[in-house]
């Protein structure tokens, strides 16, 4: 248990930041799932629309340190490749 006033404050701040980050990660995952679901359904337009929404979110969270920049790049690359394959097949 924290003894100093500063340590108590840091505990409160850490918990507040954790809850904030959990909410942001959840939102990011939801957008990724929407894009993946549109690809799975074969809906090229919805997939492109969802991809356009998720890219700035991934970039923003990578720059803020919520996720690693390579993870953001990996998600973008894989989604982009799947959408490209879907649009050429259609």
From Swiss-Prot:
Q: Which GO terms describe its molecular function?
A: small ribosomal subunit rRNA binding; structural constituent of ribosome
Q: Name one GO biological process term.
A: translation
Query: Pfam families recorded for this chain?
Result: Ribosomal_S20p (PF01649)
Superkingdom of origin organism: Bacteria
Which Gene Ontology cellular component terms are annotated? cytosol; small ribosomal subunit
Q: Which Gene3D superfamilies match?
A: Ribosomal protein S20
Q: Give the matching InterPro entries.
A: Ribosomal_bS20, Ribosomal_bS20_sf
UniProt keyword list: Ribonucleoprotein, Ribosomal protein, RNA-binding, rRNA-binding
What family does the entry list? Answer: Belongs to the bacterial ribosomal protein bS20 family.
PANTHER family associated with the record: 30S RIBOSOMAL PROTEIN S20, SMALL RIBOSOMAL SUBUNIT PROTEIN BS20C
Per the entry, what this protein does is: Binds directly to 16S ribosomal RNA.
Provide the protein name: Small ribosomal subunit protein bS20
Q: Which organism is it from?
A: Francisella philomiragia subsp. philomiragia (strain ATCC 25017 / CCUG 19701 / FSC 153 / O#319-036)
């Amino acid at each position: 248990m924290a003894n100093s006033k500063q340590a108590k404050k840091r505990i409160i701040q850490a918990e507040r930041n954790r809850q904030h980050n959990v909410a942001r990660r959840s939102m990011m995952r939801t957008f990724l799932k929407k894009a993946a679901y549109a690809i799975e359904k074969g809906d090229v337009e919805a997939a492109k629309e969802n991809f356009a929404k998720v890219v700035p979110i991934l970039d923003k969270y990578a720059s803020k340190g919520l996720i690693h920049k390579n993870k953001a790049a990996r998600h973008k690359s894989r989604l982009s490749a799947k959408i490209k394959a879907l649009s050429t097949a259609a």
